[in-house]
């Protein structure tokens, strides 16, 4: 299946197909003329797929080198970026060459940032290998790295030339790594897609059920992401809806220490906490917090952060990228399949941190 991201200045396709990673070279040849390519990945993904993708690209006429770094959110920083820059220089990459981001969200965010800043921007594509990356982070052009102050604090908007999604690679994920991706899938059902929510309701929550329906879950999620990105590429309007659960979720990730709590886990806890307080304030319908909680728990996602410290979380929130002056644009769900923006002051945000 192809989904067109029809952004006027940089349209591209998302290709979703079981087994398509084996044809990565042919796919890329249709996008780029054979040239130098660097595959950026982490050491875990490299051990599974780097050689397979490298050979496919070489068969298509590309000159390929591989850069891998130690896996983990804690490696998504400017130190790693500098190492990639140095590798690109040693390989002689020019502005006519490109990067293949092969991995999960950490790899995609970091490789995209490198591509958008090296020589003021070179071509790149995404081949996401985690559920979170396949349904969310590989699509839409947000790139970035973490700082000690906040998640993704340094970054750019830079669209890839294409996204290649192979649902079969999810079978090599560990249980926790697969389940955390469901945090984003559940979010899509809540903010925009009641049909997706109904599908999730019908699943039993097992790993087997996720893998069996992976292609459909990915397609639904990508369609929602497509709509938001095409209408609001630079995150000034409806694309903000994608941040449901992320305001508190990012604060949890930052205070826990990057890599301790996985992104989808933090999003799940953020959605539950925001909904609980918003429901108490009459801003979200009665019972929706219970529905979100039960859905997250069914798939094995955490709904409560055990190291909850209001002062630390609040401090992290003050660095949130969605803040405008003293105001945060909080995303709420007034009804299933619909989202809205609710501006709150940073002071009011303390209410949403009360357990």
Swiss-Prot record:
Pathway field of the UniProt record reads: Metabolic intermediate biosynthesis; chorismate biosynthesis; chorismate from D-erythrose 4-phosphate and phosphoenolpyruvate: step 2/7
Amino acids binding NAD(+)? 71-76, 105-109, 129-130, 142, 151
Q: Which SUPFAM superfamilies match?
A: Dehydroquinate synthase-like
| Any single GO BP term | chorismate biosynthetic process
Record key words, sorted: Amino-acid biosynthesis, Aromatic amino acid biosynthesis, Cobalt, Cytoplasm, Lyase, Metal-binding, NAD, Nucleotide-binding, Zinc
As its record notes, the protein acts as a catalyst of: 7-phospho-2-dehydro-3-deoxy-D-arabino-heptonate = 3-dehydroquinate + phosphate
Known EC number(s)?
4.2.3.4
Q: Which cofactor does it need?
A: Co(2+); Zn(2+); NAD(+)
Give the Gene3D superfamilies listed for this entry. 3.40.50.1970, Dehydroquinate synthase-like - alpha domain
Give the family, as the similarity comment puts it. Answer: Belongs to the sugar phosphate cyclases superfamily. Dehydroquinate synthase family.
Q: What does this protein do?
A: Catalyzes the conversion of 3-deoxy-D-arabino-heptulosonate 7-phosphate (DAHP) to dehydroquinate (DHQ).
Q: What name does this protein carry?
A: 3-dehydroquinate synthase
> Per the UniProt entry, what species is this protein from, by scientific name?
Streptococcus pneumoniae serotype 2 (strain D39 / NCTC 7466)
Gene name of the record = aroB
């Amino acid at each position: 299946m192809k989904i067109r991201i029809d952004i006027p200045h940089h349209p591209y396709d998302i290709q979703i197909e079981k087994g398509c990673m084996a044809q990565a070279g042919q796919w890329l040849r249709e996008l780029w003329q054979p040239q130098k390519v660097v595959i950026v990945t982490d050491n875990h993904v490299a051990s599974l797929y780097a050689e397979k993708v490298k050979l496919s690209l070489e068969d298509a006429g590309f000159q390929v080198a591989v850069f891998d770094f130690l896996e983990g959110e804690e490696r998504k920083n400017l130190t790693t970026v500098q190492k990639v820059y140095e590798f690109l220089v040693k390989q002689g990459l020019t502005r006519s060459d490109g990067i293949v981001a092969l991995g999960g969200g950490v790899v995609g965010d970091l490789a995209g940032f490198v591509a958008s800043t090296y020589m003021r921007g070179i071509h790149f594509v995404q081949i996401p290998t985690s559920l979170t990356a396949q349904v969310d982070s590989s699509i839409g052009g947000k790139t970035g790295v973490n700082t000690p102050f906040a998640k993704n604090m340094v970054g750019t908007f830079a669209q890839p030339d294409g996204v290649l999604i192979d649902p079969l690679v999810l079978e090599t994920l560990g249980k926790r790594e697969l389940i955390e991706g469901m945090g984003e899938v559940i979010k899509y059902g809540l903010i925009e897609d009641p049909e997706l929510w109904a599908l999730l309701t019908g699943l039993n929550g097992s790993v087997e059920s996720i893998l069996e329906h992976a292609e459909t879950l990915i397609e639904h999620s990508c369609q929602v992401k497509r709509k938001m990105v095409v209408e609001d590429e630079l995150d000034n309007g409806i694309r903000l809806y994608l941040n449901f659960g992320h305001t508190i979720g990012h604060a949890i990730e930052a205070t826990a220490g990057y890599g301790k709590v996985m992104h989808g886990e933090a999003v799940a806890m953020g959605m539950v906490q925001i909904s609980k307080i918003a429901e108490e304030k009459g801003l979200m319908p009665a019972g929706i917090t219970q529905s979100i909680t039960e859905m997250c728990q069914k798939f094995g996602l955490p709904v409560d952060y055990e190291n909850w410290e209001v002062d630390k979380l609040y401090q992290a929130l003050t660095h949130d990228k969605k803040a405008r002056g003293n105001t945060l644009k909080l995303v709420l769900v007034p009804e299933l399949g619909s989202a809205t923006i609710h501006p709150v002051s940073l002071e009011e945000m303390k209410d949403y941190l009360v357990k």
